């Protein structure tokens, strides 16, 4: 029986002043363990999602934890039948999740972590302002009951949204969440700096909540967007029902795929009337190469246009 592929989402805010020198040995550790996916490293820490065999993931995590700075690195696991990534990469970044505000440092200041088992009690408190820190395309397919959608298209827009809509003197309790915990952790650091005093965030993010909280007790509604070829996962962390448009990167449903405006790998109902001719031609060429590679049982020559959590 074929063993399922293990998908591990991991991150840690920690000062890595030698992150440039760390790139090559980290990449070699991924290759040695047969790992696919992308890891981002910066002075402020490490972030990414990777996949491989059980032994491979265990080997990579052991390698990471051999560094005393990463011994308690956070990671969440899920499983799938097909490899969700095509390449193995380590990227050097200014930030491991891009907020774009100087001075925000979760290594120095961060909100209160809330365990998944305690999350429901917090977010059902009428005095708590619940904010989804993810982007609009993620929120559209699933979120927590009663959560506010900032309708951002990039995490860089989050600070301006907060400044325009909320006041530390009025909004006394704020709870935030994101896919794996990293974005809301950085958002909590930002909000503390803006004067919000009681700031909470979901430890381990949505993925940890879905893993630990029974569906019958859950406050989660819908599916959860993930940054790999699975596109979404259900409450039981199995692969969801959405695909992703290669052109605009929007999650697309079965109804979207049935639309006359859907062309696999080229366009969907969300973007068919806004694509430039250059983008359309490029998408058509890319799709042809992908289909040829698939027919030959070869790796995809051009990776899907998926956003990384740090760049979204």
UniProtKB/Swiss-Prot annotation:
The keyword Oxidoreductase applies. GO terms for molecular function: oxidoreductase activity, acting on paired donors, with incorporation or reduction of molecular oxygen. Belongs to the TrhO family. It comes from the Bacteria. Transmembrane segments: none annotated. Pfam families: Rhodanese, UPF0176_N. InterPro entries: Rhodanese-like_dom, Rhodanese-like_dom_sf, TrhO, TRHO_N. It catalyses: uridine(34) in tRNA + AH2 + O2 = 5-hydroxyuridine(34) in tRNA + A + H2O. Catalyzes oxygen-dependent 5-hydroxyuridine (ho5U) modification at position 34 in tRNAs. Residues 124-218 form the Rhodanese domain. CDD domains: RHOD_YceA. The active site is at 178 (cysteine persulfide intermediate). Its EC number is 1.14.-.-. It is an enzyme of class 1 (oxidoreductase). Keywords: Oxidoreductase, tRNA processing. GO terms for biological process: tRNA modification. This is tRNA uridine(34) hydroxylase. Residues 293-312 are annotated as: Disordered. It comes from Pseudomonas savastanoi pv. phaseolicola (strain 1448A / Race 6) (Pseudomonas syringae pv. phaseolicola (strain 1448A / Race 6)).
């Amino acid at each position: 029986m074929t063993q399922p592929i293990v998908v591990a989402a991991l991150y840690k805010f920690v000062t890595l002043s030698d992150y440039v020198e760390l790139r090559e040995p980290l990449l070699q550790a991924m290759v040695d363990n047969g790992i696919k996916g992308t890891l981002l490293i910066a002075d402020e820490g490490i972030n990414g999602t990777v996949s491989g065999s059980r032994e491979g993931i265990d080997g990579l995590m052991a390698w990471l934890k051999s560094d005393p700075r990463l011994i308690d690195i956070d990671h969440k696991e899920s499983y799938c039948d097909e490899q969700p990534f095509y390449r193995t990469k380590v990227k050097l970044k200014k930030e491991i999740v891009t907020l774009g505000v100087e001075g925000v440092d979760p290594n120095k200041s961060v909100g209160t972590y809330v365990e998944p088992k305690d999350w429901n009690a917090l977010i059902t408190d009428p005095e708590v302002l619940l904010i989804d820190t993810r982007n609009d395309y993620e929120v559209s397919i699933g979120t927590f009951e009663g959560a506010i959608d900032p309708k951002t298209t990039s995490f860089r827009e989050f600070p301006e949204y907060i400044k325009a809509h909320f006041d530390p003197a009025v909004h006394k309790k704020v709870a935030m969440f994101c896919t794996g915990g990293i974005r809301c952790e950085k958002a909590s650091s930002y909000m503390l700096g803006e004067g919000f005093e009681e700031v909470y965030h979901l430890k381990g993010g949505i993925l940890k909540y879905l893993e630990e909280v029974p569906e019958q007790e859950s406050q989660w509604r819908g599916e959860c967007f993930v940054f790999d070829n699975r596109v979404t996962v259900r409450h039981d962390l199995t692969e969801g029902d959405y695909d992703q448009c290669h052109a605009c990167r929007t999650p697309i449903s079965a109804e979207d795929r049935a639309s006359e405006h859907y062309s696999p790998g080229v366009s969907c109902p969300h973007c068919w009337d806004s694509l430039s001719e250059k983008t359309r031609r490029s998408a058509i060429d890319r799709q042809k190469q992908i289909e040829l590679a698939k027919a030959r049982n070869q790796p995809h020559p051009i990776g899907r246009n998926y956003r990384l959590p740090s760049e979204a």
